Amino acid sequence: MKTIVVCSGGLDSVSLAHKMAAEQQLIGLVSFDYGQRHRKELDFAARCAARLAVPHHIIDIAAIGGHLSGSALTDNVEVPDGHYAEETMKATVVPNRNAIMLAIAFGLAAAQKADAVAVAVHGGDHFIYPDCRPGFIDAFQRMQNAALDGYASVRLLAPYVDVSKAAIVADGEKHATPFAETWSCYKGGRLHCGRCGTCVERREAFHLAGISDPTDYEDRDFWKAAVSQYSAKEVR
């Protein structure tokens, strides 16, 4: 299938891009500048596209992101430290982010006669992000079937939606993903901070997968305390 990958430049979506390059006909990556404080992730998406020799489109929706106030990713709100599944991480929710991005990606796919859009939502996202859950993925596919009825048929591929980030690390290793060429940290500093939810999740995933983590963290050990102290109930 001719497939476009929504790629932020993070570990999950870059691993997905390498997976799709191996298993499907990858025809491009699409990324979004929504005014995120960790915009440097887009540089890693560009490197991924160059590495896989496919076109890379960066869609500027910063004007929209500016109206989605109250998120630590787009507003003057501190990025919390701690486990990625804790209630405090709701500060990192950008309302309707995936719905907005996927709607644009599907329009792009239809215009380019692509067969599928692939997105790297995963099981670890279910706790906090409603637009990463299986119910959302299924509902979005139904909506797009109606939106493109008679014009195009585009599938939404979410191969990681029911698996852990550790499983993504293992899959990325299988498909030769250069993990050092990915960016996760929400704070967007020179190095991964090692303390925000996505850094904790990244560090834990490599540990659980039994794969060496090449990432340079400002705080390499905080994740252990964060993981030992959290409790959260998954929502699907």
UniProtKB/Swiss-Prot annotation:
Binding-site list for ATP: 7-17
Cofactor: Zn(2+)
GO biological process: queuosine biosynthetic process
Pathway connected to this protein: Purine metabolism; 7-cyano-7-deazaguanine biosynthesis
GO molecular function, one term: zinc ion binding
EC category name: ligase
InterPro entries, alphabetized: QueC, Rossmann-like_a/b/a_fold
UniProt cross-references to Pfam families, sorted A to Z: QueC (PF06508)
Highest taxon of the lineage: Bacteria
Residue numbers binding Zn(2+): 185, 193, 196, 199
EC number(s) on file: 6.3.4.20
Key words of the record: ATP-binding, Ligase, Metal-binding, Nucleotide-binding, Queuosine biosynthesis, Zinc
Purpose of the protein: Catalyzes the ATP-dependent conversion of 7-carboxy-7-deazaguanine (CDG) to 7-cyano-7-deazaguanine (preQ(0)).
Similarity section: Belongs to the QueC family.
Protein name (record): 7-cyano-7-deazaguanine synthase
Organism the protein comes from: Rhizobium etli (strain CIAT 652)
